[in-house]
């Protein structure tokens, strides 16, 4: 999207998400200033029969694409949730160069293989039906979600819209691989790359521990504090989100 000679902005979706549901509303707001590239993860692309491998294998594929099509240099990358882990990995590995890396209120959770397996095995049966069918399999969970959406206003509805509709082509194994691999793939501490700024949209309602986590993994992160919930700026305030991205990357 956008002019071929414009600065490149790479958009990376969140956990088990499709690029269009995450970024469809903001691409038109960005395409006047950037050449916008959206990552479609293996296993979550309706045009392919693939499964998500691991975070590092997917990172290598992204790097290879950027080397081939962008000369290995882009203006900025924005990672929504899980996508922020990819931004961190791209910065730390230094196989491509970006002027700005932006993390969208990513949690950057990490766990031991055993703990990650337990978390994955517990959450996957709950999450996968939502990916495949667009709704929870357990009726009581769907009722609670519907009630929460009615009571909480725009955020839950907007967040569910960002998560996307039913995607029967996504396998449980892809979701499992993505969730588990994200937890066990280490992100180095005090990442510092000359010529690369790291910006983080810090959603304060997620909790104070994330400030310390961001400062643990990045040497000089620029925190953009917002009294919001996880990815609420992107989900509910796309115009403001696009304005902030432009103010950082242009």
Which residues fall in each region the model found?
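Flexible "cap/lid" loop of the alpha/beta hydrolase fold
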Residues: 92, 98-130
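Conserved serine/cysteine hydrolase catalytic core
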Residues: 173-215
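Conserved alpha/beta-hydrolase catalytic His-Asp/Glu region
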Residues: 112-113, 133-191
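Post-His helix in hydrolase/transferase enzymes
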Residues: 233-248
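Active-site loop/oxyanion-hole signature of alpha/beta-hydrolase fold enzymes
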Residues: 37-76
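Conserved HGGG/HGGXW glycine-rich cap/lid loop of the alpha/beta-hydrolase fold
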Residues: 1-48
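Conserved loop-alpha-helix segment in the C-terminal half of the alpha/beta-hydrolase fold
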Residues: 28, 197-231, 237
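Gly/Ala-rich beta-loop-alpha elbow adjacent to hydrolase catalytic centers
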Residues: 79-87
């Amino acid at each position: 999207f956008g002019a071929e000679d414009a600065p490149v902005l790479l958009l990376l979706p969140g956990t088990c998400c499709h690029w269009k549901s995450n970024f469809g509303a903001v691409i038109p707001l960005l395409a006047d200033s950037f050449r916008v590239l959206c990552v479609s993860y293996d296993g979550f692309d309706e045009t392919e029969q693939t499964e998500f491998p691991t975070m590092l294998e997917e990172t290598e594929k992204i790097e290879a694409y950027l080397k081939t099509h962008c000369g290995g240099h882009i203006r900025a990358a924005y990672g929504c949730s899980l996508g922020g882990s990819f931004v961190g990995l791209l910065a730390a590995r230094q196989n491509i160069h970006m002027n700005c890396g932006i993390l969208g209120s990513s949690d950057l959770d990490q766990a031991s293989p055993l703990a990650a397996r337990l978390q994955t095995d517990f959450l996957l049966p709950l999450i996968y039906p939502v990916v495949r069918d667009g709704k929870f399999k357990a009726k009581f969970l769907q009722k609670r979600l519907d009630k929460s959406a009615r009571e909480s206003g725009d955020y839950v509805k907007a967040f569910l819209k960002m998560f996307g509709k039913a995607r029967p082509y996504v396998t449980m194994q892809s979701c499992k691989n993505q969730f588990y691999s994200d937890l066990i793939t280490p992100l180095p501490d005090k990442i510092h790359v000359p010529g690369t700024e790291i910006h983080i949209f810090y959603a304060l309602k997620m909790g104070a521990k994330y400030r310390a986590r961001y400062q643990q993994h990045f040497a000089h992160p620029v925190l953009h504090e917002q009294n919001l919930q996880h990815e609420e700026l992107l989900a509910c305030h796309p115009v403001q989100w696009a304005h902030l991205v432009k103010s950082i990357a242009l």
